[in-house]
């Protein structure tokens, strides 16, 4: 089962590539926590949707971490991936999450999950997502959103 990881954001508000920033005691990134939790839940292919603008930096920090555990693929989300007749010459921002998921469609062969590389998801979320996706047979359209109850914690 495939997990699409939306990681093409440039981090303009953050001031850098938030998805590659070490936060754990051994330099783990939010992305590391997510990928390892997804693998533990049963996902066996990770497709990173990245930008060509930082692909060398991204692959330098990510490549080799997960390939021994799962199938890892990299696809690009850039303005240049749009057909020329659809491009807006004044636009510099990416075209959103749906467009990013479409970039990974070559590697989707059944039910799949989608996460943002810069968000933290608890490990239970990946298990809930994987377990639900496992129940899907031949659905043309089915969706699940793993949500959290907001409370004072």
Where are these regions (language model features)?
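Short, hinge-like loop/turn segments at secondary-structure boundaries
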Residues: 64-66, 131
